């Protein structure tokens, strides 16, 4: 189970009507079945790189449920390669999915929420949007962009009754890494001892962040000091990453 399904499950369990989106229609329907609450869930195929598809699912959601109270941008994939060797076409595709897809969805749903007078947009970003990761620099760049667009939109929309929350998980135990686009220059900069957190923990943090109207949610909490450490002493964090890359940990 990935982060998206875990979020859908916890929101459905809390009583929300939920629409699940993914490129693969069969995969989305299977997730809907596992989540349950089929009387108030909907599974739709959508490629967020295509604005017309986003507009279509927004219209279908309004047709079925009359309003959109929460929109969660979670589509994305990793990319593992060095800045020197990264394939530019793959780089652009990663930005199309991870960043421009989220931006397009925000532009599609904001007018709906403005008309309602309320709504929440939740962008699933990453700690990598605070601390750039070597050999994951393109992925980090998409998350830095996601952090900026979410926090900027939060200020712009403050008087519209629309809240924007940015969620930054650390390492999560999913197939995300295995499904990442891999180039020719790959090195590990995460110690093998780091197990990561569960998707259920991320989903609960998302729900609590929504209920509390948070500006940003970092999960696990232990990532907060790491982010502050990088902000205050970037050289120290960079040194540790260079050491891990050299040792191939």
Protein language model features and the residues they cover:
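The beta1-alpha1 cofactor-binding region of Rossmann-like NAD(H)/NADP(H)-dependent oxidoreductases
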Residues: 25, 46-56, 88
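Substrate-binding pocket helix/loop in short-chain dehydrogenase/reductase
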Residues: 82-83, 87-92
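Active-site helix of classical SDR
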Residues: 106, 142
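Canonical Rossmann dinucleotide-binding motif of NAD(H)/NADP(H)-dependent dehydrogenases/reductases
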Residues: 1-17
């Amino acid at each position: 189970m990935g982060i998206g399904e875990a979020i859908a499950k916890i929101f459905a369990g809390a009583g929300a009507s939920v629409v699940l989106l993914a490129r693969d229609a069969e995969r989305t329907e299977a997730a809907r079945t596992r989540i349950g609450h089929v009387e108030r869930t909907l599974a739709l195929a959508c490629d967020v790189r295509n604005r017309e598809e986003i507009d279509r699912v927004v219209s279908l959601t309004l047709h079925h449920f009359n309003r959109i109270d929460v929109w969660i941008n979670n589509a994305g994939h990793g990319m593992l390669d060095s800045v020197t060797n990264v394939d530019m076409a793959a780089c652009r595709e990663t930005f199309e999915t991870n960043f421009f897809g989220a931006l397009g969805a925000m532009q599609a749903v904001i007018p709906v929420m403005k008309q309602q007078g309320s709504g929440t947009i939740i962008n699933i970003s990453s700690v990598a949007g605070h601390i750039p990761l070597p050999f994951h620099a393109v992925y980090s760049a998409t998350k830095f962009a996601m952090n900026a667009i979410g926090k900027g939109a939060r200020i712009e929309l403050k008087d519209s009754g629309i809240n924007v929350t940015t969620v930054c998980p650390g390492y999560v135990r999913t197939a995300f890494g295995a499904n990442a686009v891999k180039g020719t220059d790959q090195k590990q900069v995460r110690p093998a001892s780091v197990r990561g957190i569960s998707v259920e923990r991320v989903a609960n943090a998302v729900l609590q962040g929504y209920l509390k109207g948070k500006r940003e949610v970092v999960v696990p909490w232990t990532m907060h000091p790491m982010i502050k450490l990088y902000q205050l002493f970037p050289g120290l964090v960079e040194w540790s990453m260079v050491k891990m890359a050299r040792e191939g940990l």
